[in-house]
Amino acid sequence: MTKVVVCALYKFVSLPHFESIRAPLLAMMEQAEIKGTLLLASEGINGTVAGTQEAIEALLVWLNGQNGLDNIVHKLSFDDEMPFYRTKVKLKNEIVTMGVEGIDPLKVVGTYVKPQDWNALISDPDVILVDTRNDYEVQIGTFKNAVNPVTETFREFPEYVKQNLDPAKHKKVAMFCTGGIRCEKSTAYLKEQGFDEVYHLEGGILKYLEEVKAEESLWEGECFVFDNRVAVNHDLKKGQYDQCNACRMPITEVEKQSPAYVQGVSCPHCIDKISDEQRKRFVERERQVNLAKARNEAHIGSDVNQVIEARREKKEAQRRLAAEKNNAKKSQVL
């Protein structure tokens, strides 16, 4: 069986004409039968895609030939099945959304630490180790002694820093994320806030798992990934977790035995949070998914990435609307 190559990539680079890249990039991906999502913005490119080894190599060569997109940071892993259902290239304001204006990793960023040197750094008692990922990601795996900020989205990370970290007290801060991109912005943000020694795991967790032997590793658990594999183990192979199609939380086989778990409808994490209307919608979606499977077709309802992204976009739209209303009220007062 031909292995599917999964490629996570990103690069912060000034792309003033990023809109013009979308069409030829999408055409190249479709021709090579590459699936997944790439984001383009004026600050660079980010995303995860999958295809044959030849297709992924062709994509990297194609990107390398585009002005500014050479030498892209990328990590490869492998799967027996295609983890995506769609091919998408999206235009965004940011390639990773922190929501803080003026943060530019091209101008200032933390000190990169190679995976081989990471254990020594985080074993230093003077270093505070912070996991920049969301809480549901942290729950299934993290580094030994890492602090969990308990955030739902990356937008909440700046507030966590304001409330919990102090440049005068926390002299050395080390941070990590899945592939490294969130730390590009989080370390840049900390530097802007006056923190002096700020460190960043180069290549993220995925690069660490790739290069550090399991017997020497300080990683505990599995690493959440934003595709249908849900999580990967230390060998970068699909882990033991599944995902609830209702709330998107990772779930174990034990949790799937719970009366609260209904495939595509609910799980122990969300059984008390979903409304009757949502439940009916999820039941119908699951019915459509099963019909599509019976016809040997992919159904939009089973596309994990699309559901996650839609939920995030909805939350961001709600935040923007709330901010606009708040600004309008302030203007009326003035």
Curated annotation (Swiss-Prot):
Catalytic reactions of this protein: uridine(34) in tRNA + AH2 + O2 = 5-hydroxyuridine(34) in tRNA + A + H2O
Sequence ranges assigned to domain Rhodanese in this UniProt record: 123-217
Superkingdom of the source species: Bacteria
GO BP terms, alphabetized: tRNA modification
Family matches, as SMART domains: RHOD (SM00450)
EC numbers for this chain: 1.14.-.-
UniProt-listed Pfam families: Rhodanese, UPF0176_N
Keyword field: Oxidoreductase, tRNA processing
Active site: 177
Broadest EC class assigned to this enzyme: oxidoreductase
Family indicated by similarity: Belongs to the TrhO family.
Chain's role: Catalyzes oxygen-dependent 5-hydroxyuridine (ho5U) modification at position 34 in tRNAs.
PANTHER family: RHODANESE-LIKE DOMAIN-CONTAINING PROTEIN 7-RELATED (PTHR43268:SF3), THIOSULFATE SULFURTRANSFERASE/RHODANESE-LIKE DOMAIN-CONTAINING PROTEIN 2 (PTHR43268)
Name this polypeptide is given: tRNA uridine(34) hydroxylase
Gene: trhO
